[in-house]
């Protein structure tokens, strides 16, 4: 088996890199794909590396408009106990992290969401797995009913943000991905200023959405730009005081009367010191 199942090297010139020589699959089960490789070490010696190949996963922090969070209670067989954790699951073949998050939120919690904030990516078991988990927060929840997979059993409970933090401090929540996701979400909420990219999909072109968004952002004294995209969506970069940005994002869920916003994807963006005022940009 000559092909390398690991992600591409982040830095080909890393002096600490271990170079794969070859390897084999030693176990291919329903869940686990276990590999054993031979690799050259930085000093030229050889070593064996055993690890699990993982398709990737997504976690969703579902948040009601009043701030309550949806958490699952689910039995985890290896630990012989139930855990409190946010909805999460593996990516299906050919599925993006966002598509997987939308699917998992419906299947496990029974909700659709209009607003999707990408919190970041974590690597939970860097010593023996390729697993990477993309973390999202989802708002604008609408109940549609859960669609659990066969053999999947769980209970849904709700926490406030302080209540969930208290449960972590007390040791009642120990799931690492849930702790990381809450920390990133809390950091977003606590930040005094925002810089974010928005992608708005739905019936948003040809109905004045772009011009409406520009006026709304200018009234909120935000900096940035907005433009139509060839794929039919509207893209914006907004930068400014957190409460003003959040009000603008909430307003974007409605938009002008003739539009129909299906989804807003939000991703943190570097602060652009050159942004002044709010302007229209050419379509991409």
Can you say where each PLM-predicted feature lies in the sequence?
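Intrinsically disordered, low-complexity, mixed-charge
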Residues: 192-284
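Extreme N-terminal tail/first-helix region
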Residues: 1-28, 192-199
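Conserved Nudix-box catalytic region and its N-terminal flanking loop in Nudix hydrolases
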Residues: 2-10, 14-17, 49-52, 58-103, ...
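Conserved beta-strand segments that form the floor/walls of ligand-binding pockets within enzyme
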Residues: 70, 85, 104-106, 117-118, ...
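Acidic, metal-coordinating catalytic segment for phosphate/diphosphate chemistry
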Residues: 18, 22-59, 65
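Unchanged
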Residues: 47, 56-59, 64, 90-176
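Acidic pyrophosphate-coordinating catalytic loop
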Residues: 25-29, 122-134, 190-191, 271-275
């Amino acid at each position: 088996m000559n092909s390398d199942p690991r992600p591409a090297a982040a830095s080909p010139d890393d002096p600490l890199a271990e170079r794969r020589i070859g390897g084999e699959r030693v176990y291919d089960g329903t869940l686990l794909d276990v590999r054993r490789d031979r690799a050259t070490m930085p000093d030229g010696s050889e070593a064996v590396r055993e690890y699990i190949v993982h398709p990737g996963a997504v976690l969703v922090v579902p948040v009601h408009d009043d701030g309550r969070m949806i958490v699952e209670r689910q039995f985890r067989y290896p630990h012989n106990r139930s855990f409190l954790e946010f909805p999460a699951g593996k990516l299906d073949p050919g599925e993006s992290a966002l598509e997987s998050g939308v699917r998992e939120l419906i299947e496990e919690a029974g909700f659709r969401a209009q607003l999707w904030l990408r919190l970041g990516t974590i690597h939970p078991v860097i010593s023996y797995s390729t697993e990477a988990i993309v973390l999202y927060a989802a708002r604008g929840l609408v109940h549609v009913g859960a669609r659990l997979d066969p053999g999947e059993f769980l209970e849904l409970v709700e926490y406030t943000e302080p209540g969930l933090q208290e449960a972590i401090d007390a040791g009642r929540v120990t799931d690492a991905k849930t702790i990381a996701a809450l920390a990133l979400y809390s950091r977003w909420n606590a930040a005094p200023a925002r810089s974010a990219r928005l992608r708005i999909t739905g019936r948003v072109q040809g109905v004045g959405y772009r011009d409406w968004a520009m006026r709304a952002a200018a009234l909120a004294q935000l900096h940035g730009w907005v433009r139509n995209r060839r794929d039919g969506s509207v893209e914006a970069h907004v930068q400014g005081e957190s409460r003003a940005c959040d009000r603008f994002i909430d307003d974007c869920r409605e938009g002008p009367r003739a539009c129909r916003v299906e989804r807003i994807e939000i991703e943190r963006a570097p602060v652009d010191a050159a942004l002044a005022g709010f302007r229209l940009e050419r379509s991409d």
